[in-house]
Amino acid sequence: MVHICRLFVVMGMLLCLSAQFASSQHWSHGWYPGGKREIDVYDSSEVSGEIKLCEAGKCSYLRPQGRNILKTILLDAIIRDSQKRK
């Protein structure tokens, strides 16, 4: 009986942890269920400076970062390894 209780506790903890890491849609900021979005027409005066920079191709957060991930991980590992040796 004790093993079954422990099993249920562990399964409950795993369920809670997996819910934290699961991807789900956040229904705010104009999004509605079904993937529908509220359509608003913005005036040109409401366009922020960041959007203007993105239209010019200067926004860093829209650039693909996939190629540099492995390089960054390897460099961090090398730096940590060299710091441990000192």
Swiss-Prot record:
Statement: the UniProt record of this protein carries the keyword Chloroplast: no
CC annotations in GO: extracellular space
UniProt similarity note: Belongs to the GnRH family.
Pfam families found in the cross-reference section: GnRH
Protein name per Swiss-Prot or TrEMBL: Progonadoliberin IIA
GO molecular function, one term: gonadotropin-releasing hormone receptor binding
Tissues showing expression: Olfactory bulbs, hypothalamus and telencephalon, midbrain and posterior brain areas.
Residues with Pyrrolidone carboxylic acid modification: 25
Residues spanning the signal sequence: 1-24
Keywords: Amidation, Cleavage on pair of basic residues, Hormone, Pyrrolidone carboxylic acid, Secreted, Signal
Modified residues (Glycine amide): 34
UniProt xrefs under InterPro entries: GnRH, Gonadoliberin
